[in-house]
């Protein structure tokens, strides 16, 4: 932050976490504050709602656009929005020349093991040899699909371990 820039002290309150305090510039976006909150709470930015009084702050707007531009302390309230758990259509893309596609109906609450079992049903490839990625991340056993930020229409990519060399 430039030495002459006015500095804000932002306090974020929540029922679930201790008071969080951040220094900010009036021209910082609300999203930047949400990223600070994520670093302390692990709550994804898209699942956060920040309130100034009863007004919901929009991620792309700057703090100054809400009249927050002087050297002062502001108090924000954090609410966590739980994503719904409806079935989401995802497409599984097999590796190889054919790149076959399969439709999978997956819930955010589905475990990676459950998804790998669905993949076995569609492809015949056993879970032990499956390498599945979504949004650039390898799906790990013991995790839930919600951990990967899945959305309707995401692609899952399937590759396999080569057994025996």
Swiss-Prot record:
Belongs to the ubiquitin D family. Interacts directly with the 26S proteasome. Interacts with NUB1; this interaction facilitates the linking of UBD-conjugated target protein to the proteasome complex and accelerates its own degradation and that of its conjugates. Interacts (via ubiquitin-like 1 domain) with the spindle checkpoint protein MAD2L1 during mitosis. Present in aggresomes of proteasome inhibited cells. Interacts with HDAC6 under proteasome impairment conditions. Forms a thioester with UBA6 in cells stimulated with tumor necrosis factor-alpha (TNFa) and interferon-gamma (IFNg). Interacts with SQSTM1 and TP53/p53. Changing residue 79 to Q: Decreases interaction with MAD2L1, no effect on the interaction with HDAC6, UBA6, NUB1 and SQSTM1 and moderately attenuates UBD-induced tumor formation in vivo. It comes from Homo sapiens. Induction: Rapidly degraded by the proteasome. Cell-cycle regulation with highest expression during the S-phase (at protein level). Induced during dendritic cell maturation. Negatively regulated by p53/TP53. High levels in various gastrointestinal and gynecological cancer cells. Induced in RTECs in common renal diseases including diabetic nephropathy (DN), IgA nephropathy (IgAN), and hypertensive nephrosclerosis (HN), as well as in hepatocellular carcinoma (HCC) and during HIVAN. Inducible by the pro-inflammatory cytokines IFNG/IFN-gamma and TNF in cancers of liver and colon. Can be acetylated. The record marks 164-165 as: Activation by thioester intermediate formation with UBA6. GO terms for biological process: aggresome assembly; myeloid dendritic cell differentiation; positive regulation of apoptotic process; positive regulation of canonical NF-kappaB signal transduction; protein modification by small protein conjugation; protein ubiquitination; proteolysis; regulation of mitotic cell cycle phase transition. Common types of chronic kidney disease are associated with tubulointerstitial up-regulation of FAT10. FAT10 may mediate NF-kappa-B activation and may promote tubulointerstitial inflammation in chronic kidney diseases. It holds the Pfam family ubiquitin. It is found in: Nucleus; Cytoplasm. This is Ubiquitin D. Constitutively expressed in mature dendritic cells and B-cells. Mostly expressed in the reticuloendothelial system (e.g. thymus, spleen), the gastrointestinal system, kidney, lung and prostate gland. The keyword Zinc does not apply. Keywords: Acetylation, Cytoplasm, Nucleus, Repeat, Ubl conjugation pathway. SUPFAM superfamilies: Ubiquitin-like. One of its GO terms (molecular function) is proteasome binding.
